Amino acid sequence: MGQKINPLGFRLGTTQNHHSVWFAQPKSYSEGLQEDQKIRDCIKNYVQKNKRIPLVEGIARIEIQKRIDLIQVIIYMGFPKLLIEDRPRGIEELQINLQKEFNSMNRKLNIAITRIAKPYGQPNILAEYIAGQLKSRVSFRKAMKKAIELTEQTDTKGIQVQIAGRIDGKEIARVEWIREGRVPLQTIRAKIDYCSYTVRTIYGVLGIKIWIFVDEE
């Protein structure tokens, strides 16, 4: 069996960038890492609670930049209206919540939202879409094909979608996948976006993996 490496970690420094940009002493590094995770979880929970459409979060990624006196959080969203339109003070509220959570009086916390032009070119948003379809008991093949149709509008060069688990409630778990175009996982200069997503259905847990071949550098 071939050993599968995470496509994002494999390309760090060439076509992929870090989502956390800061330096720390070895002693305090783990604290900084846990803090990042808490910030991401806090933002996701807030969006989950305050969104209009129940199945779409629309967060592609969250970047965190830290300086001595400032934590800058950039949320890349496919559908920022979900967060901004309903609550004009949504970002301020989120900022206050995070500030309370970390009671970091000596550090200012700043949140910015960046809109992604083609949200369905992002594997996280696509995985959420497929998860929503599976929860609504749409057949998995139909959900996968629809996801591929959505990416066709975004100028991607290839996509692979994989669903694993008790598909359609069958007794035996299996893996089903579908590929459209090229997905060169071994080419380091190929910019590949990847995401793995867990969805809880009434039959059990399903795993969704999506690889999107964006471009070659």
Swiss-Prot record:
Subunit structure: Part of the 30S ribosomal subunit.
Annotated family: Belongs to the universal ribosomal protein uS3 family.
Pfam families: Ribosomal_S3_C
Main localization, broad class: plastid
Signal peptide annotation: none
HAMAP family registered for this protein in UniProt: Ribosomal_uS3_B
Organism, scientific name: Platanus occidentalis
GO molecular function: rRNA binding; structural constituent of ribosome
Any one annotated GO CC term: cytosolic small ribosomal subunit
Subcellular location field: Plastid, Chloroplast
Gene Ontology biological process: translation
Key words, A-Z: Chloroplast, Plastid, Ribonucleoprotein, Ribosomal protein, RNA-binding, rRNA-binding
Protein name in UniProt: Small ribosomal subunit protein uS3c
Domain of life: Eukaryota
Keyword Plastid: yes
Taxonomic path: Eukaryota, Viridiplantae, Streptophyta, Embryophyta, Tracheophyta
Disulfide-linked positions: none
Ranges of residues in domain KH type-2: 43-117
InterPro entries xrefs: KH_dom-like_a/b (IPR015946), KH_dom_type_2 (IPR004044), KH_sf_prok-type (IPR009019), Ribosomal_S3_C_sf (IPR036419), Ribosomal_uS3_bac-typ (IPR005704), Ribosomal_uS3_C (IPR001351), Ribosomal_uS3_CS (IPR018280)
